């Protein structure tokens, strides 16, 4: 009889605990919620801009991953960009052109212009440099002084450096040209232009951006 009463008491206690919820080690109801799935962690990932959504007038802040389909690069934190123009060949996504203005945060004047285009009349690195100097002269309607410096290696690309001085401005250019295979009849000209009034050619920002720039091969 005592054994039966003891079993009934144990059974009653078990039912009581089950009704009140699972007890923790102190005999208190465990009300802890697993917050791993609901906590929001700070988003530190880079903004992503792709060719599918890129259009004139688009802008954004670094850090940002820019993908124009025929080139990609990373814009560091502390800078912003604005798309001046973008287009691509519907039959070949590696053919197209893009021009972006780059600004320091809080500044209204661009410090640099990045241009990549397959719509050009050049077929080599040397012609790319000549084309850059010629365009500078045409834009100012007056011949300036151009000095071709030593080549510079950034990331996967070798850039010719050009320093241009005119009556109106002083600029540095980093110019590279890529032929992307036997089927590439146009090649890609990439030109990074900086305004010396706002940034110098040895600024760490330039290395950081150009180190990240990749030309997409066919």
Predicted segment positions?
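Bacterial lipoprotein signal-peptidase II cleavage site
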Residues: 4-6, 16-41
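Repetitive helical segments and hydrophobic/amphipathic motifs
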Residues: 11-12
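N-terminal low-complexity, Pro/Thr/Ser-rich intrinsically disordered segments
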Residues: 33-77
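Short, hydrophobic/aromatic-rich segments at coil-to-beta transitions
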Residues: 58-65, 94-99, 153-163
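Secretory pathway targeting signatures of secreted, lumenal, and periplasmic proteins
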Residues: 69-126
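Stable alpha-helical elements in mature extracytoplasmic
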Residues: 75, 125-132, 202-209
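Surface-exposed amphipathic alpha-helical segments
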Residues: 79, 188-218
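Signature of long, low-cysteine stretches enriched in small and polar/charged residues
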Residues: 131-183
